[in-house]
Design a protein with these regions (language model features):
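Generic structural concept
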Residues: 49-52, 56, 91, 95, ...
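Short helix-adjacent coil turns
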Residues: 101, 105-112
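Membrane-interfacial loop-to-helix junctions in multi-pass inner-membrane proteins
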Residues: 40-48, 109, 146-154
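Conserved alpha/beta core surface patches that mediate binding of polyanionic ligands
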Residues: 9-13, 115-119, 123, 173-182
Length: 241
């Protein structure tokens, strides 16, 4: 869309702020490649608003399963070999994501940062890790090791996402950070340093193994959806693999 005052199709920042909020406008800026012509219309803004809702749902899930608490964790004290393989794989994902974040941040490719963070939240977390571990969080004994290990990961994920998203979702991350630090109004997410992840979290062999599992899982889910669409089964629980 080429905006022109003479055509009367200009979308003012004030209009965007009033309808969508400041962070949606910030997402539009962050998601745009400044090396190309910038495009904006209400359809594009609605797409960003939908992505924002998914991100808020990710934060809501993390907060709900951590009881609105965020603990300070010394990463060097984590015995990674004692964690389930799935948790080790997610730590590997976090390590790689942080490497990409620093690379893109230092080269001012903010749109690539946003793209990778959004993909991590919607694909790696919501559609994969959260989906697999929901039974553990909701059904296992409160103090079981498996559940505690999962909550450890959720704590690390929440802390990392708040710091990564702070330059983009400035108001949302501050709102969440204030919720987690009710007793200290002087604290701000924008004063926190980025995490430094141990090299031991990087595990290429583990990633290769889990990628095969993910490929099989995706194929199975695709077949299940086809069977549901054809009314062969009513629920995925009825499928035999």
């Amino acid at each position: 869309l080429k905006m022109s005052k003479s055509l009367g199709n200009v979308i003012s920042p004030e209009e965007i702020l009033k309808k969508y909020g400041a962070d949606i406008l910030r997402i539009w800026v962050a998601a745009s490649n400044y090396a190309e012509d910038l495009r904006i219309d209400h359809k594009i803004l609605e797409q960003h608003a939908d992505a924002y809702r998914k991100l808020r749902n990710t934060f809501r899930y993390l907060l709900g399963n951590l009881n609105d608490e965020l603990k300070e964790i010394d990463f060097t004290q984590i015995k990674i070999d004692s964690l389930p393989e799935l948790e080790q794989f997610i730590l590997h994902k976090l390590y790689n994501l942080n490497e990409s974040f620093m690379k893109h941040f230092n080269s001012y490719n903010i749109h690539l940062i946003y793209k990778e963070l959004l993909n991590f939240c919607t694909v790696d977390l919501s559609s994969f890790y959260f989906d697999i571990r929901k039974d553990t969080l909701y059904c296992d004994e409160k103090n079981s090791k498996k559940r505690k290990d999962c909550q450890l990961l959720l704590n690390i994920i929440l802390d990392s996402l708040l710091k990564w998203f702070a330059p983009i979702l400035s108001f949302t991350t501050e709102e969440i950070f204030k919720l987690l630090n009710k007793n200290d109004s002087e604290k701000s997410i924008h004063l926190k340093k980025l995490n430094v992840f141990p090299q031991s979290w990087h595990n290429t062999k583990l990633e290769q193994n889990w990628q095969r599992i993910i490929d099989i899982r995706n194929e199975v889910n695709s077949s299940i959806e086809t069977m549901r669409a054809e009314k062969i089964i009513g629920s995925s629980l009825e499928a035999n693999i």
